[in-house]
């Protein structure tokens, strides 16, 4: 019997913590970029970007800084224009949620999220709990680019550090929903170049702005004269060795302390084709009041002593789509049409779009790929597909492939399509072509993607099908691109779109993640 994802989490919380353990980087090999990290009492919170995926701004929680569990999203829907609904032939690829910030304000027991959307202004979402419900509370006209929120521990004043190269600090109104004042606090010298990705802190009476030089450096600004400076600067790291073979330099992210008073830096590493993944290292504070990173052989360590007793959380297992809502680990490609899906002992996907282009097919549901290698297996009941429908699973990015079922009249075919590509402006350049097919006459199919997202070129996603859930046949493979410009890494995705008329449906009965996940043909 396979445990559900939720059951696995329950098992994890029952494991007895062990003192003196070590952890290995990355702490979670999943695409969770532009992170903000903070602690409330004995729980750590992690907020990330996810661009055009919905719901947006995923939130994770942890008791030990190493094992993380998805708990929700700060932005329930991308309500920033019709293109986020794929309306009128438009899309919002590589737009939406960039680096943003989240904090808890104890004085009014409210959680806050701030993010600038397409440079048009900063949206503010609030909630009574980290898990929600989150609602939009305000829009501030100023774009707080790469915002970092500080709630001053001494007087409860809210500040936001933001900007690119020209770094600013804004003081917010008492309710945090508008701006009281703002000023530039630091102009980056040409000798450093670009600084962005602000996070703002206060420690021992000094104010700090933690900024990145993308994508190979991290700097710290410090002021003992107040939040508006003046600030002095010090390099924390530059061109540092990565704990992931062939991975980028750890950078951006944020600082966090434990209840014991120890400090840590959670950065992310460019790790394509899988995306940008989190990595953790200890921090000490020097006599000059600046933080210093604990290195191993002059590089970011592959492993360190655990910050706290570890309580493992599993990211493998089976989701049976029980209940009436999707778990927070799932995100749609753009906003879904909520009238075209339902969750009740399975996920029913009604066709929501008439198209021949997966990149324009609404209600495509995605799941991050667990690295360095894993497989994702979807079980589909296809008995209610209609003529012209296409249902299947994809390795989804700006260069994609999929395996699925084609329903044409009374004929049902298993097929693999490859060569789905986008232009540099993220418009579809090719809808792909069929590279393999097989006759099929059943009503249930198992579709599996095995993905190797170790960093580098030539990494493969392999596509399999089964008619009984036991013997799997390989239909083809995709060489995944490892360019960074799309930002988001490859994801598993399940879809059902029409090429003729709406009305058909499929039921996704379950989804299983296995790691390392290598499949042999049966």
Predicted segments with their positions:
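Carbohydrate-active catalytic/glycan-binding domains of CAZyme proteins
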Residues: 18-522
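Fungal secretory targeting signals
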Residues: 1-21
């Amino acid at each position: 019997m396979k445990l559900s994802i939720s059951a696995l989490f329950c098992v994890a919380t029952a494991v007895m913590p062990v003192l003196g353990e070590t952890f290995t980087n990355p702490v979670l090999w999943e695409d969770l970029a532009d992170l903000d990290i903070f602690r409330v009492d004995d729980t750590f919170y992690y907020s990330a970007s996810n661009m055009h995926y919905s719901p947006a701004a995923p939130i994770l929680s942890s008791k030990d800084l190493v094992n993380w569990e998805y708990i929700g999203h700060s932005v329930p829907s991308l309500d920033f224009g019709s293109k986020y609904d794929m309306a009128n032939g438009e899309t919002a690829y590589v737009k939406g949620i960039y680096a943003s910030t989240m904090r808890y304000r104890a004085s009014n027991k409210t959680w806050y999220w701030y993010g600038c959307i397409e440079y048009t202004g900063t949206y503010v979402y609030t909630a009574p709990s980290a898990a929600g419900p989150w609602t939009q509370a305000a829009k501030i006209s100023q774009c707080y680019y790469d915002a970092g929120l500080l709630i001053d521990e001494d007087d409860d004043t809210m500040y936001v550090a933001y900007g690119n190269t020209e770094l600013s600090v804004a003081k917010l109104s008492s309710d945090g929903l508008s701006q009281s004042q703002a000023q530039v606090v630091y102009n980056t010298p040409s000798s450093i170049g670009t600084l962005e990705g602000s996070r703002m802190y206060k420690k021992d009476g000094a104010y700090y702005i933690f900024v990145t030089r993308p994508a190979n450096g991290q700097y710290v600004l410090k002021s003992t004269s107040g939040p508006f400076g003046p600030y002095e600067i010090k390099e924390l790291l530059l061109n540092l060795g990565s704990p992931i073979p062939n991975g980028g330099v750890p950078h951006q992210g944020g600082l966090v302390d434990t209840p014991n008073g120890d400090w840590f830096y959670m950065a992310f590493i460019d790790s394509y084709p899988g995306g940008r993944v989190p990595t953790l290292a200890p921090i000490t504070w020097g006599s000059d009041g600046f933080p210093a990173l604990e290195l191993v052989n002059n590089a970011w360590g592959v492993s360190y002593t655990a910050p706290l007793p570890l309580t493992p959380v599993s990211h493998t297992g089976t989701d049976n789509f029980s209940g009436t809502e999707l778990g927070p680990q799932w995100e749609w490609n753009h906003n879904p049409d909520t009238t075209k899906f339902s969750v009740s002992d399975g996920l029913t996907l009604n066709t929501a779009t008439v198209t021949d282009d997966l990149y324009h097919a609404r209600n495509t549901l995605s799941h991050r790929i667990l690295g360095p290698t894993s497989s994702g297996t979807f079980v589909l009941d296809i008995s209610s597909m209609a003529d012209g429908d296409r249902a299947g699973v994809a390795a989804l990015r700006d260069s994609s492939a999929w395996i699925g079922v084609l329903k044409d009249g009374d004929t049902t075919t298993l097929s693999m399509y490859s060569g789905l590509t986008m232009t540099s402006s993220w418009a579809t350049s090719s809808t792909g072509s069929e590279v393999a097919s097989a006759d099929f006459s059943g009503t249930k199919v198992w579709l599996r993607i095995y993905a190797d997202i170790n960093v580098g070129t030539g990494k493969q996603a392999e596509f399999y099908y089964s008619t009984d859930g036991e013997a799997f046949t390989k239909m083809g493979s995709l060489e995944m691109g490892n360019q960074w410009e799309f930002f988001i890494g490859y994801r598993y995705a399940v879809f059902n779109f029409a090429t003729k008329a709406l009305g058909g449906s499929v039921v996704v009965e379950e989804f299983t993640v296995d790691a390392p996940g290598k499949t042999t043909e049966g």
